[in-house]
Amino acid sequence: MNAVADKVTLEQFRAKYAECKPYYELQDGEPVQKALPTKRHALLQGILYTLLRELGFQSMTELTLAISETWEPTPDVCGQLGPDDGQPYPTKPVPVVIEVLSPEDRFTRVIQKCRRYARWGTPDILVFDPVGREAWHWDIATDDLVRVKQGYAFKSKLVELNLDDVFERLDAENS
């Protein structure tokens, strides 16, 4: 991820970076380019999208969260519950945010993002590593990521995501 030096307003950010790929995120007033996704990243993103739908969430990929004037992230996968509010971007915290690591991602920046999602009130924050075949969830009590061992029980809905299922699907897609 590359950070651009000058601070910008939300309006300036959207005017300059809205159509750029790889995507940019606004982080504390600074445009930060997301890492270029690999094939494995893209496959895992699609699998997580599908699994969230199967678990009863309305899932979306690369959805910009327009909740703050200074921080506008674009998580890899989001999950929502309930009726659509008709807005182009969520303006309130979504129940599920998933980040998929790319080789260039700095883990400290990922932790910072997770901490911000938690401050917003997002109950289910997950991070997946498609290469290391690991996943973490955000733990409010420790204010840190905790490794998912076998499955993750969502807080926003009484369902569970099985980690073996995730990576078995990734293996099947990758073969």
What positions do the PLM features span?
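Gly/Pro/Ser/Thr-rich low-complexity, intrinsically disordered segments predominantly at protein N-termini
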Residues: 1-175
